[in-house]
Amino acid sequence: MEIPNGYSIDKEITKEGYITQSYPYGECTWYVFNRAKEFGIQFDPYMGNGQDWAHKSGYEVTNTPTKHSAVSFQGRQAGGHPTYGHVAFVEDVKDDGSILISECNFVQSGQGTGITDYRIFSAEEARNFYYVIGK
């Protein structure tokens, strides 16, 4: 998986040591829960579906793009599932506010369970999302 030009990530994505715990293997929630742990960031093992992460009690949520946060897409937002939404990990935030996310099981991109890919959003798009700050 190639990192898009002009963006960078702080740690290679290997998925080694990722656990299933309460999130099914290969789902977006499984990926973000484990990717955050690689940076010492904790999320509750019961955050719910992707769109539910933005509404989990006890977590700071902002519309300001934040590096190493979880970005919680509401149903149909940015191609998220209409019922469950989607969640991804913010790898990079540019000075202009555009973001690079990594994600797993984003079926619309032709990928599926356990498959990781990247997407870029412009600053204008990124301002419409919920960023959940881990602990």
Positions of predicted regions on the chain:
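Secreted/periplasmic proteins that engage bacterial cell-wall peptidoglycan
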Residues: 1-95, 99-104
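Aromatic- and glycine-rich peptidoglycan recognition patches
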Residues: 93-135
